[in-house]
Amino acid sequence: MSKAFKLTSKFKPSGDQPQAIEKLVAGLEDGLAYQTLLGVTGSGKTFTIANAIEKVQRPTLILEPNKTLAAQFYAEMREFFPENAVEYFVSYYDYYQPEAYVPSSDTYIEKDASINDHIEQMRLSATKAITERHDTIIIATVSAIYGLGDPDSYLKMLLHLTRGDQIDQRKILQRLAELQYTRNDLELRRATYRVNGDIIDIYPADSEREAVRVELFDDEVENLSYFDPLTGEMLRRVPRITVYPKTHYVTPREKLLSTLDQIKIELKERLSQLEKANKLVERQRLEQRTKFDMEMILELGYCSGIENYSRYLSGRNEGEPPPTLIDYLPKDALLIIDESHVTIPQLGGMYRGDRARKETLVEYGFRLPSALDNRPLRFDEFEKLAPQTIFISATPGPYEEKQSDQVVELLVRPTGLIDPEIEVRPVATQVDDLLSEIKKRAAQNERVLVTTLTKRMAEDLTEYFTEHNVRVRYLHSDIDTVERVEIIRDLRLGVFDVLVGINLLREGLDIPEVSLVAILDADKEGFLRSERSLIQTMGRAARNVHGKAILYADRITDSMKRAMEEAERRRIAQSAYNEKHHITPKSIQKAVTEIIEGARTYTERGRFVNQAQLIAEEESKYIAMTPKQLAKELRKLEEQMYHHARNLEFEEAAAVRDKIQHIRKGLLEVKE
């Protein structure tokens, strides 16, 4: 059921925000295809966009350059729109090794992937929301331009049930099998169902914590209700329900059969070509692999790598763009590209890398030529499909500057914070000078970001600072997304004072505690020291009232000059605003919260809690007990362990067993 977008916030637009909202909304209503929101760090770009969405009342897709920023934006939008559908659509792979062939060493690398079940559920929830509700905001990464199942086929496969319907139980079970749900009478999990007499319990693939109960009386649907799959408690009765498929790649049976006919025709043509070219090994390989896939599709309705036949499954012609998340959007949707100076080049680069890999697979008989149409969108195709667009960036790139019909500036921060003061200091003494600056900041409980040009320099610097009793960490490209978020969180909490990095301390890092940004070798002109990179890096200190940026350089390059001039322009605009409205700058106060749900565990009561905190709390509880109480607690835990084992819940039983061993080893020794 759709509602109107309703923004919930204790803040009202202030500073440059009211005029920016007004201009963006007017631009959308006037039909401008592209607009740019040029917003300085800490000016409230997210809040401005949220207000614009509320005013235009249009479903919105927001593209982010990486999962970290997508999670940050998702958390903020959920706070702003608690009553609306705010969804998250990113790649569901924790690990992904694409199928590839290396001719030089005759090495075939099979596709290998580990899918994150929770993110898969969120992706399915996103497409469900956008098809059912107008009040939907989806936060996505470039995953949104990769091929997804055809929306028409997907929507044809929905299972609709209404109270009073005449339908045979076998027919419902057959439809669930077509939706790729599996029967599991022991444990009800996502995308499974169980049958108990005339009652069918279904756990929808897109649902996080609600299952569906279908009660039949003979061949009539007598009752439909939602229940908690963990406790079995009934939540509410409903007059009708819709069950969505387990995957975006489900296809009606008749379409599968016509797909097999088309694959046969293409296979015959391709085998003939390979035979004429005397590529007999490739011919045999292709025939064997394709026939195996066809057999699987005929029997099960899918096969491993079914996406390679997506041209036929979605009924497209050769070379036509694949269906993507953008095809699921309604006609009046709005597209917002955050950190556009990074996201736009990403969108442009996806197609080429994918194409090169697949051409090798086709040439050596691992795939049919139609597999080349299982691909991300080309940039020109993305442009044609994209609805009205707003770019967001503190440093818009050349594409945005060229395309935008209007640039809306957001230079004034409501907090009164002025762009960091910039100083240029000589390179010769940069390390020792920086060390003395760090000690000053650490004494005031403030944090420091240091950016270097090379990995070696970052490592050496970290080692040097550690020797001088500085609490320092080094952020490098080998650190995964969740760990990176944890390091930034520790920096904010004061676990350490200095974070050293290369190109990782840029877009969207929201760390109000940072009062100093040091850029080493700032005069080495190049990508890492371009005007945009310098503005973005210096902006990390713009959320603190004592913000300062030190550029270590022996000369002022053109990039430095332009970056410093832009910072000065922004400082003048902010100072004039502060003077006019009698504002005293204040540092941004922001609670340190978890933004990535993967770093948390879901408890039975529906709350997310930090895993480490959970263990620490448990331990402190047992330490406080007397030996008698501890023995009683151990007996209780043993009963719990046997109960899980009797119910075949072996994972839960193992977890309780480990807890018992931990108490016996650690805590009982301490007590003795």
Curated annotation (Swiss-Prot):
A motif (Beta-hairpin) lies at residues 92-115. SUPFAM superfamilies: C-terminal UvrC-binding domain of UvrB (SSF46600), P-loop containing nucleoside triphosphate hydrolases (SSF52540). ATP binds at residues 39-46. GO terms for biological process: nucleotide-excision repair; SOS response. InterPro entries: Helicase/UvrB_N, Helicase_ATP-bd, Helicase_C-like, P-loop_NTPase, UVR_dom, UVR_dom_sf, UvrB, UvrB_inter. GO terms for cellular component: cytoplasm; excinuclease repair complex. Pfam families: Helicase_C, ResIII, UVR, UvrB, UvrB_inter. The keyword Nucleotide-binding applies. Keywords: ATP-binding, Cytoplasm, DNA damage, DNA excision, DNA repair, Excision nuclease, Helicase, Hydrolase, Nucleotide-binding, SOS response. Forms a heterotetramer with UvrA during the search for lesions. Interacts with UvrC in an incision complex. Belongs to the UvrB family. This is UvrABC system protein B. It comes from Coxiella burnetii (strain Dugway 5J108-111). The lineage of its organism: Bacteria, Pseudomonadati, Pseudomonadota, Gammaproteobacteria, Legionellales. The gene is uvrB.
